[in-house]
Amino acid sequence: MRYSIEKITTLIGARRIGEAEANVSWLLTDSRSLCFPEETLFFALRSGRNDGHNYIPELYRRGVRNFVVERGRFRLAADTQFERANFLEVVSPLEALQRLAERHRDEFDVPIVGITGSNGKTMVKEWLYQLLSPQKVVTRSPKSYNSQIGVPLSVWLLGEQTEVGLFEAGISQPGEMQALRDIIQPTIGVLTSLGGAHQENFRSMDEKCQEKLSLFHDAKVVAYNSDDNVVSRCMRKSGYRGEKLSWSKEDPQAAMFIKKIERRESISTLYYIYKGKEGTYHLPFIDDASVECSIAAAVVALYLGVTPEELDVRMSQLEPVAMRLEVKEGQHGCTIINDSYNSDINSLDIALDFMSRRPEQQGKSRTLILSDIYQSGMMPQELYHRVMELAVKRRVNKF
């Protein structure tokens, strides 16, 4: 989706310096990922080790004309070297990025799945994508984009064709989830598991669990493991009033009761009862982590309309998440970047960006081997034009 620079100025409450007409389709926080400069809005973020304002002259030379800067931090905005550029001054570029993503999210009335937990977020998200994408256009977080910066960049990917959104939310200390909740606004919540990650920043496991559950305050339904005593206790204390979509190996009253799990060689067979109806699915993994993540993905997929028969077929075909952006050394000094597990336009851009950033690839010929991209929601002519644009921008030599 495109937004005019005038509308963005209003949405983030900025003071605009510059009067150049512009439309924005891409948000950028890392100068190395620049692809479409003429439609890019750069947010000059500051951290303890870096300052995005230092990259503005370089990005301007590369064609970027729209920048969000910290008020009083960048004093060259009126300089003639930045002709026909727009500078949007705000108190905090990070908060402006989050606010813009929040306003963008407001435009969509589709199921949005928010996924949080100490472990398994990415696996549940990616497997849900595989379970849902054969029949729905799914927009999801790239890689593990679950931070205060990654979440708004992910939500910005929501487009007119999106039918379901899948977004991760990760926190490391109290108070961080509020901003992510406002951006994602999940209609469906998934709590994967609790673990010791970042526990040093919380007084207790209960406090960490409550912080994570706060993501789902306004969700219509929350999926969680009711066998986890901490999670069950925190759910009761939270006062959550929506539908509780629990899964359990112990409680037959759970929304999804796992009756039995059989493990043979490399396949697990799970026998379950979902809302009173029995079903079975076969999973091509036997480790505990994969089995647990499959249950979380299954209960949400069933809730979203995947039939038990479809679930079994798609579960049996699940690919390991580790296949994402697999790098292999080929013959004659070439490097192979395999992203065949993913097949959508955003993943293609990420893979090409990954290729262009690798130091050993500088100066080498770049070849793109691509199958068709299904479930994009685009007309073929629009899709192939978009692929061609990406290939040209990322300097692919052979296609």
Give the residues covered by each predicted segment.
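Mobile, glycine- and charge-enriched loop segments
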Residues: 33-44, 138, 149, 153-165, ...
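Active-site beta-alpha connecting loops in nucleotide-dependent enzymes
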Residues: 48-50, 321, 340-399
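Generic hydrophobic/aromatic pocket-lining and core-packing "Φ" positions
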Residues: 56, 177, 212, 352, ...
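Acidic, Mg2+-coordinating active-site environments of NTP-dependent enzymes
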Residues: 75-77, 83, 190-335, 357, ...
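N-terminal leader/targeting and accessory segments in enzymes
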Residues: 1-99, 376, 389-390, 394, ...
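Phosphate-binding loop of NTP-binding sites
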Residues: 95-242
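Buried hydrophobic packing segments
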Residues: 97-100, 128, 132, 154-155, ...
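Residue-level signal for inorganic ion chemistry
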Residues: 8, 40, 59, 100, ...
